[in-house]
């Protein structure tokens, strides 16, 4: 009997269950590391078909999750992240197709050189091994993480939030169907089959050495816990306090379009703008139109004293507002002294995630892009492009804001490490 079936009938303790899942994933990782690209792509193609064929079941399961979340009084932003629609399910399938079409990173020789003694040294991409993904409300993370780990030759253990449990299970069923059609082990993509929160602690401990890296996708408290307690490396961002700076040289219509999209396209995503910075030199031309547009679009604006004067609907900003990830239709706004003032504000209040400048002045843009210490910096584009799909990665497993190994959207290539292959002809070291 498999570990997952033991969990369902309640005959195994959680520690035993999780340890077994880790061992099975480790065994699957050894198989995936050697799987040819064609076999992995066959699995991905079958997963894409299964997601489309199983859309009704996925949506029905999600509807139950959403009903429970509404009954529990969750926020509108949370419900948006939890809710699947036919379009979002189709986007999952399309994302799988894109991942299938990207180059397989495993085995790629990134560098090669020959030493004076005749040895050839190659640096080659290899899988990380077993990736644990701990996430909260977004059920589509199950699909994104599963297919990216498969493409990069990694086994993955998925631990979704209890609120999205049914949705994740329905999606996982489709992924496993694809694995089976391609002759790959079920344990290549494992879903923790329990809502028990103690499972998270066991994952953070590494499952007796089975887990190589952890990726948390969720709120500040989850990510902070993972970074504090994990005994294995973590790819994570704590929060997305993202800024849009509108320079004095900015085209007003472009600025309005970018600011509105950055804040209001989807307020609950980590790439949403949370603070609007406007060049003091553009206050008379740009401030009122931007603030009025946001408020008229249903966004609450919290501003400094100057911003409050342009529209009576602006609420006073507190010190905490400059450090807040709202994930809702709320934005903080203030004037700054040019690009230097914007950079200084972001340095003091940013989260190293995503920040944008709207400017026609290429020197101001270059200064911003060069000096803002964030994983993603944009010139004349919305912060909502902070997404692996928009980078051409097909999907992302998360956005890393640290400075080791992976930074920015974590796609298939970022889920590999490297080893050195050395070819000799009998050389010995003197």
Curated annotation (Swiss-Prot):
One Pfam family in the UniProt entry: Aldedh
One GO location term (cellular component): cytoplasm
Keywords from the UniProt entry: Amino-acid biosynthesis, Cytoplasm, NADP, Oxidoreductase, Proline biosynthesis
Record keyword Cytoplasm present: yes
Gene3D superfamilies: Aldehyde Dehydrogenase, Chain A, domain 1, Aldehyde Dehydrogenase, Chain A, domain 2
Signal peptide location: none
GO biological process, one term: L-proline biosynthetic process
Molecular-function annotations in GO: glutamate-5-semialdehyde dehydrogenase activity; NADP binding
Catalytic activity: L-glutamate 5-semialdehyde + phosphate + NADP(+) = L-glutamyl 5-phosphate + NADPH + H(+)
CDD domains according to UniProt: ALDH_F18-19_ProA-GPR (cd07079)
EC numbers, comma separated: 1.2.1.41
Function, as annotated: Catalyzes the NADPH-dependent reduction of L-glutamate 5-phosphate into L-glutamate 5-semialdehyde and phosphate. The product spontaneously undergoes cyclization to form 1-pyrroline-5-carboxylate.
HAMAP family linked to this entry: ProA (MF_00412)
Family: Belongs to the gamma-glutamyl phosphate reductase family.
Name this protein carries in UniProt: Gamma-glutamyl phosphate reductase
Lineage: Bacteria, Pseudomonadati, Pseudomonadota, Alphaproteobacteria, Hyphomicrobiales
Gene: proA
């Amino acid at each position: 009997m498999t570990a997952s079936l033991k969990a369902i009938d309640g005959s195994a303790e959680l520690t035993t269950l999780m340890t077994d899942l880790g061992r099975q994933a480790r065994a699957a990782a050894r198989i995936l590391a050697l799987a040819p690209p064609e076999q992995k792509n066959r699995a991905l193609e079958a997963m894409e078909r299964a997601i489309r064929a199983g859309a009704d079941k996925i949506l029905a399961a999600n509807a139950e999750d959403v009903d429970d979340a509404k009954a529990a009084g969750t926020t509108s932003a949370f419900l948006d992240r939890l809710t699947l629609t036919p379009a979002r399910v189709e986007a999952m399938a399309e994302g799988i197709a894109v991942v299938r079409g990207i180059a397989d990173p495993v085995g790629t020789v990134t560098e090669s050189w020959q030493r004076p003694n005749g040895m050839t040294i190659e640096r080659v991409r290899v899988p990380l091994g077993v990736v644990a993904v701990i996430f909260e409300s977004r059920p589509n993370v199950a699909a994104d993480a599963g297919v990216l780990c498969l493409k990069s030759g990694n086994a993955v253990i998925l631990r979704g939030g209890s609120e999205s449990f049914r949705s994740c299970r329905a999606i996982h069923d489709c992924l496993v169907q694809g694995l089976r059609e391609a002759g790959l082990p079920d344990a290549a993509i494992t879903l923790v089959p329990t809502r028990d929160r103690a499972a998270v602690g066991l994952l953070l401990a590494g499952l007796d050495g089975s887990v190589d890296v952890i990726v948390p996708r969720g709120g500040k408290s989850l990510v902070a816990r993972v970074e504090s307690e994990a005994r294995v490396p973590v790819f994570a961002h704590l929060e997305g306090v993202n800024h849009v700076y509108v320079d004095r040289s900015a085209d007003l219509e472009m600025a309005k379009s970018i600011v509105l999209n950055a804040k209001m396209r989807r307020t609950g995503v980590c790439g949403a703008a949370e603070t609007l910075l406007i060049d003091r030199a553009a206050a008379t031309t740009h401030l009122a139109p931007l603030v009025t547009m946001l408020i008229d679009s249903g966004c609450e604006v919290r501003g400094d004293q100057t911003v409050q004067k342009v529209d009576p609907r602006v609420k006073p900003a507190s010190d905490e507002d400059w450090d807040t990830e709202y994930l809702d239709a709320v934005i903080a706004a203030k004037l700054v002294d040019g690009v230097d003032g914007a950079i200084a504000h972001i340095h003091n209040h940013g989260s190293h995630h995503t920040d944008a400048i709207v400017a026609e002045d290429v020197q101001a843009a270059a200064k911003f892009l060069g000096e803002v210490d964030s994983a993603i910096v944009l010139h004349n584009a919305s912060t909502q492009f902070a997404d692996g799909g928009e980078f051409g990665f097909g999907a992302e497993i998360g956005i890393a804001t640290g400075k080791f190994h992976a930074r920015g959207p974590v796609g298939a290539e970022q889920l590999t490490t490297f080893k050195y292959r050395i070819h000799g002809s009998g050389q010995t070291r003197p």
